């Protein structure tokens, strides 16, 4: 299996004087599901943001698809805690926004979308059980429904690596379990790598591997694999 994420002697945080976490060695392969747990403020979101290339490491090596530069357009999908949806637009518009990551700029400007893009958008909306809300403005949806829109948007993007920060929050337990199963089957069927930050320990342990960020003696977080 080819490595999608490789981190060696990685230090992350906001400045050299405020290192949040130190990661000696982390390798994540294609098609693998990895979960990250840990107390609030310990560096879970910061780690995801570094992998997404939204934040630079303080030190060490972090390779995504074997490169330290920014991944290709649309190759990495990120579901943040703050969803970033266009709330006055429809569910369809928001999911389409993810799908056009792989289209040309010219096509996107003029709205000339290939049928396969339209099909992907509708498939993603259907998987998240939102077909009946497809033409509804996002602002009229519940918090849980909006979260499902964000997940559908990332699925439609066709990313090879999906990073999800508490992506099941605001969902009731039954819906969260359903969405987890759909996402699990989707990434496994398409050999997509999924890295999730998850507060529910039992659900986190359903991943192929589970890691915990925990405080060391010098108050810098370290990443430890959790036995399942």
Q: Where are the predicted features?
A:
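Conserved ABC ATPase signature
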Residues: 137-141, 145
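A short, flexible loop at the N-terminus of ABC-type nucleotide-binding domains that lies
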Residues: 1-7, 11-24
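Catalytic Walker B motif of ABC-type/P-loop ATPase nucleotide-binding domains
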Residues: 162-166
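Hydrophobic anchor residue at the start of the ABC signature
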Residues: 97, 151
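Conserved ABC transporter NBD signature motif
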Residues: 60-74
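Helix-to-loop junction immediately C-terminal to a conserved catalytic motif
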Residues: 52
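Conserved ABC ATPase "signature" region
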Residues: 108-133
């Amino acid at each position: 299996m080819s490595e999608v994420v490789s981190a060696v002697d990685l230090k992350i945080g906001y400045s050299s004087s405020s290192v949040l976490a130190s990661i000696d060695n982390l390798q994540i392969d294609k098609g693998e599901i990895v979960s990250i747990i840990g107390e609030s403020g310990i560096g879970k979101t910061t780690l995801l943001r570094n992998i997404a290339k939204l934040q630079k490491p303080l030190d060490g090596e972090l390779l995504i698809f074997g490169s330290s530069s920014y991944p290709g357009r649309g190759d990495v999908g990120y579901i943040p805690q703050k969803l970033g949806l266009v709330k006055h637009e429809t569910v369809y518009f928001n999911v389409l926004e993810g799908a056009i990551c792989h289209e040309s700029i010219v096509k996107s400007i003029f709205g000339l979308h290939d049928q396969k893009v339209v099909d992907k958008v509708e498939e993603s909306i259907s998987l998240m059980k939102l077909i009946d809300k497809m033409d509804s403005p996002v602002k009229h949806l519940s918090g849980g429904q909006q979260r499902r829109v964000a997940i559908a948007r990332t699925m439609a993007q066709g990313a090879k690596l999906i990073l999800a920060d508490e992506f099941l929050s605001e969902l009731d337990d039954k819906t969260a379990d359903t969405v987890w199963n759909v996402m699990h089957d989707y990434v496994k069927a398409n050999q997509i790598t999924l890295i999730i930050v998850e507060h529910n320990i039992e659900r986190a342990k359903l991943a192929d591997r589970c890691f915990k960020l925990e405080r060391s003696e010098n108050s810098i977080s370290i990443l430890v694999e959790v036995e399942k």
